[in-house]
């Protein structure tokens, strides 16, 4: 995906189950991978997997940090009512591994309110 994004001069972020898997919230690897892009949408076959690029809204790419856009997509996939203590602990772990202290405040304002609360709770743990 990085090569395609570089070639097209577009930003690309994983959505849904792909983001959840990449961040360690899920062990399931989706067969049909969907990415949001600032470029044009299309479908590609890579081996036995289908990769779909969908043109995303600018708000999905407004984040300054590298972790937050993917985290927002993963939490959207998990759902507000399915957040567990394990998810909150993993969020804290992610921010320990990838500290984004200079962008976190700005990025939190862009996230939906329920996600903001979950992320803040996870960071405090």
Residue ranges, per PLM feature:
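Generic structural signal for residues positioned in beta-strands
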Residues: 34-35, 52, 70
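Short gly/ser-rich loop at a beta-strand->alpha-helix junction or flexible surface loop bordering the NTP-binding
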Residues: 5-46
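Hydrophobic alpha-helical interaction segments
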Residues: 55-125
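HTH-adjacent hinge/linker in prokaryotic transcriptional regulators
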Residues: 1-3
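A short, charged helix-loop
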Residues: 45-55
């Amino acid at each position: 995906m990085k090569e395609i994004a570089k070639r097209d001069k577009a930003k690309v972020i994983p959505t849904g189950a792909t983001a959840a898997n990449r961040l360690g919230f899920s062990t399931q690897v989706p067969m049909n991978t969907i990415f949001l892009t600032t470029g044009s949408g299309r479908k590609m076959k890579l081996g036995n997997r289908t990769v779909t690029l969908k043109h995303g809204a600018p708000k999905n790419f407004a984040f300054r940090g590298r972790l937050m856009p993917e985290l927002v997509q993963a939490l959207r996939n998990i759902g507000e009512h399915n957040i567990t203590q394990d998810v909150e602990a993993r969020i804290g772990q992610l921010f320990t591994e990838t500290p984004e202290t200079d962008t976190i405040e700005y990025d939190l304002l862009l996230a939906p309110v329920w996600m903001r609360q979950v992320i803040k709770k996870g960071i405090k743990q």
